[in-house]
Design a protein with these regions (language model features):
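Cytosolic covalent-transfer regions centered on His/Cys nucleophiles
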Residues: 1-168
Length: 168
């Protein structure tokens, strides 16, 4: 089996799917479902999800989260779903200084949430975006810097650096 990133021209960059305008430097949410709803609302405000689809998208992400937690441990969660409301893969990032219970594998709170919504009809793009996110989240240095991002510009700089220097 060939990894997605090994296919010529198939590597997806953060700037192709992360909506920097939808970054939330300090989530107001105290729990997982509210954090997801807050990030979906940020994507609606940024024009990435139609407002009439907001409740349905949030509900779909929460349903997916109830099936299996996306709290991968080490303070990070990547809730994700495929949904007809989007035509392109889109992501929003939210930070929590107090931490949110995502029923993570390590049973620790989540401080950085990357919400990923993908179109139903393009599973390859979904996998490419997921591969990029998880490849970087495996690195302690990346997670540390991600948690320190408090503005869209800081987030954009970090993700650009990560795309340009995948080995760090």
């Amino acid at each position: 089996m060939v990894a997605v990133s090994d296919k010529a021209g198939c590597k997806m960059r953060f700037d192709e799917f992360v909506c920097f305008e939808a970054m939330i430097p300090e989530l107001q949410a105290a729990d997982r479902d509210d954090a997801i709803t807050e990030l979906v609302a940020a994507l609606v405000k940024a024009g990435k999800i139609p407002s009439e689809s907001a409740k349905d998208v949030a509900k779909a992400v929460i349903k997916r989260e109830n099936e299996a937690s996306t709290g991968m441990g080490k303070g990070v969660a990547v809730p994700h779903v495929k949904h007809a409301a989007v035509k392109n893969v889109v992501a929003a990032v939210g930070q929590s200084s107090t931490g949110i219970d995502f029923a993570s594998l390590d049973e620790q709170p989540v401080y950085s949430v990357i919400l990923l919504i993908s179109p139903v009809n393009n599973p390859d793009k979904h996998l490419q975006a997921m591969e990029n996110v998880f490849r970087h989240l495996q690195k302690e240095k990346f997670r540390k810097f991600l948690r320190q991002c408090h503005t869209p510009a800081e987030l954009e700089d970090l993700l650009k650096e990560a795309d340009e220097n995948p080995s760090w």
